[in-house]
Amino acid sequence: MILMVIVFLLLLFWENELTEDVVLTSMEHLHVDYPQSAVPLRYCNYMILQRVIREPDYTCRKVHVFIHERPQKINRICTSSKKMTCPNYSEIFCFQSDTKFRMTVCQLTGGSKYPACRYQISPTEGFVLVTCDDLGPVNFQGYVE
């Protein structure tokens, strides 16, 4: 009986670990900030620290984009008629949004190792490019102004 309880607890812990990793790498976690967080100063620095956005080797990401649109609107990109080959990938298809989305582009200005990264904020609007699977957007591939 005790062995069964231990096995159950181990499985429960292991399942939660996997779920947390998936959430932390999802497109919504990495790129969607709706409604836009009310951070008056240093928006990019704050958001990148809060969401632990960095390269796998703990270096600072050179450029990062936050999209300020409803997740439902972002999910609809996958049904767009604007299907094309993704930039820099010859065999992967991207979908482009039908309308321009409000975004914030964070450009690295200082630091090289996370968390000592400093960013400049650039509000912009553009057509969003994503890759999709059967459940919706998977990866943000960029934007077109």
From Swiss-Prot:
Cite the InterPro entries for this sequence: RNaseA, RNaseA-like_dom_sf, RNaseA_domain
Keywords assigned: Glycoprotein, Secreted, Signal
Q: Which residues form a coiled coil?
A: none
SUPFAM superfamilies xrefs = RNase A-like
What's a single GO CC term here?
extracellular region
An example GO BP is:
defense response to Gram-positive bacterium
Q: Where in the cell is it found?
A: Secreted
Looking up Gene3D superfamilies in the UniProt record yields:
Ribonuclease A-like domain (3.10.130.10)
Glycan-modified residues:
N88
Main localization category: secreted
Q: Which GO terms describe its molecular function?
A: nucleic acid binding; RNA nuclease activity
Could you name the domain of life of the organism this protein comes from? Eukaryota
Task: Please state the span of the N-terminal signal peptide per the UniProt entry.
Answer: 1-19
The family classification in the record reads: Belongs to the pancreatic ribonuclease family.
**Its job:** Does not exhibit any ribonuclease activity.
Name-wise, this protein is Probable inactive ribonuclease-like protein 12
Its lineage opens with: Eukaryota, Metazoa, Chordata, Craniata, Vertebrata
